Amino acid sequence: MNKKVKKIFQSNEPYIFLIIILLGIVVQIRSGQFFTANNIVDLLSAMIVPGLFAIAEFMALIAGGIDVSFPALASLSAYATTKFLLDKNYEGNVLLAFVIAIAIGAVLGAFNGYFIGYLNLNAMIVTLGSASIFQGIMQGTLRANQLSVIPPGMKSFGTAAFLTATNKANGLTSILPYTFIILVLVCAVMHFVLHYTTVSYTHLTLPTI
């Protein structure tokens, strides 16, 4: 047990966590609203998209490269999927949207992977270029603009509340969407992959816990 505790405090993460807690306490003292239930729910909700992006980028970093195209790739996948389903007047559940978006993302990722993995080009240079290509496809080919309407299934999933919290002091209610579960599942899968598969031995050394 002592060895595990010692290993934990030899890394940077516990100290970053403590700094965040201390900052939260300072804000709580000044405003009295930081540790309220609805604010915690808002923070968790705000973590979903950055958290998914961070996990994906982390995998690229431990593989020895850096991907700067992922915001453009994600935007193109999401926009193309939404536009396609709108054009087809699709009114089914959100599962098809996930399948299409993942397929588009896989194709775009394979495009990057070909130049990086097979042609041995610098990952940062390749993804800088592909980011411009993806943005060009969105703006030029798809003529992207703000979508005021999205398919019913996507809207229902995005607005469905996994958890709600109300601040009794001011009456504000916050909603944690079901996409938070996706973030938790992705974190769990990555934890397993990085600690209990050959990936952890090939690219980095992580203790099994």
Regions found by a protein language model. Give the residues of each.
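Membrane-interfacial amphipathic/re-entrant helices at transmembrane-helix boundaries
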Residues: M1-A54, K88-L96, T173
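Transmembrane helix-bundle core of multi-pass membrane transporters
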Residues: K7, M124-V199
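Hydrophobic alpha-helical transmembrane segments
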Residues: P14-L18, L43, A72-L73, L95-A103, ...
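Generic alpha-helical transmembrane segments of integral inner-membrane proteins
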Residues: L18-V26, I55, V99-F111, I137, ...
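Single transmembrane alpha-helix segments in multi-pass membrane proteins
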Residues: V27-R30, F34-K88, Y114-L121
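Alpha-helical transmembrane segments within multi-pass membrane transporters and channels
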Residues: Y90-A131
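Conserved small/polar residues in nucleotide/adenosyl-binding loops
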Residues: T202-T208
